[in-house]
Amino acid sequence: MNKQARHFKIREILQRHSVENQHDLLQLLREQGMSVAQATLSRDCAELGLMRVRVNGSYRMVVPDDNAGRIIKGLVGIEVLSINANETTVIIRTLPGRAHGVGSYLDQLKSPLVLGTIAGDDTVLVIPASVHNISSLIAYIHSNLSKT
């Protein structure tokens, strides 16, 4: 089964069932005759932007609505303390323990300006695709990490 069909089936299952985690989702997929590896399901969940939300005291996996991107952008923006750069790299300082989330968010945006990110505890190193586009990269980061 191709990725598009899996994504459709995952969305369908999450709309019809209360699913707490990937293991439960994997079981439901298998019950419906789909053979999916855990690693593949994990990638699918990341690509779909699935979130775990608390509902009536327990967690449930959900597909984010169209408003979720704006909300996530605002939440990630709150975690950023500063953005600085030199001629070759950009450094983002975050609240303690939040660098991984900020770096992961930037990676998921898949900008052609970003070659990659490396995150520590409170610092994200953003490696530009070209050192000639540092100012464009900084503007891009600011626009995608706004608090509003």
Swiss-Prot record:
It is found in: Cytoplasm. InterPro entries: Arg_repress (IPR001669), Arg_repress_C (IPR020899), Arg_repress_C_sf (IPR036251), Arg_repress_DNA-bd (IPR020900), WH-like_DNA-bd_sf (IPR036388), WH_DNA-bd_sf (IPR036390). Keywords: Amino-acid biosynthesis, Arginine biosynthesis, Cytoplasm, DNA-binding, Repressor, Transcription, Transcription regulation. GO terms for biological process: L-arginine biosynthetic process; protein complex oligomerization; regulation of arginine biosynthetic process. Pathway: Amino-acid biosynthesis; L-arginine biosynthesis [regulation]. The keyword Cell cycle does not apply. GO terms for cellular component: cytoplasm. The keyword Zinc does not apply. One of its GO terms (molecular function) is DNA-binding transcription factor activity. Regulates arginine biosynthesis genes. Belongs to the ArgR family. This is Arginine repressor. It comes from Chlorobium chlorochromatii (strain CaD3). The lineage of its organism: Bacteria, Pseudomonadati, Chlorobiota, Chlorobiia, Chlorobiales.
